[in-house]
Every structure is written in structure tokens, then in C-alpha cells.
């Protein structure tokens, strides 16, 4: 079975909808936006529906630990779910919650850069830009 992965706030209700249609589907949801504290989240009139949408996923991801913590806190305070630092218990089903910061692993990129197979590709790119740089210098001199 394919993994279904949903990205961002426009689609927060989709995991629950999918869960109703495909109960065994592995569903992930990643929120690129901030998740507010439960005190602020409680101000939403549709707070329960939004949280239930999230909880249709098997895995919910956030960019920072504080956003994940806010989400878990909202599930506990608004829906009364039991939770831990890594997940929320929804009627005996655990929804995992994780932190997945977006960024580049500079050490890993540097490691790949040093591999022998990469050297010719790096040279080709450098050579391509040297010609462009020479043209730029000549254009400025004209």
C-alpha cells in the first residue's frame, strides 16, 4: 500500500477524511506553518474539527519542538486525549508526533562532495560558470 503524505495547513481536514475512506492507509501530515499554544488555539470555533482532522494521520510532523508540544497540548486540553511527548492516544490508536526541521545537512553534503564520482560533475559546473563570469567581466569593460 502506498504512503499518503499531506503537506500544510490547507489540507488539515484531509487525514480524517482519508481515514474514513481507507482505514488502514499509512497517512502522514506535515505542517509547515506555526502551531499556536492551546490557549490561542482554543479561540478557533472549529478547533475540535481541525484537531480531529490532524488525528486522522499516523504521523504528524512539525518544524520545531515547540510547535509539536503546542499541538500535543491542544489535543490534551481541547479533546481530552491522553498524550506523551511523542504522540497522542486517540481511542487506543497512537498518532505519532515528530519534529522534522527543514534544512540542509551540511556535513552530509560535504561528505558527498568529496566522493570521487562527484569531482567531474563539480568541474563541469565550475567550467560552465567560468565562461559566464568571463562574459560578465567583458560586458562590464565594454
Task: Identify what each model region corresponds to.
Residues 1-142:
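Catalytic cores of carbohydrate-active enzymes across secretory and cytosolic contexts
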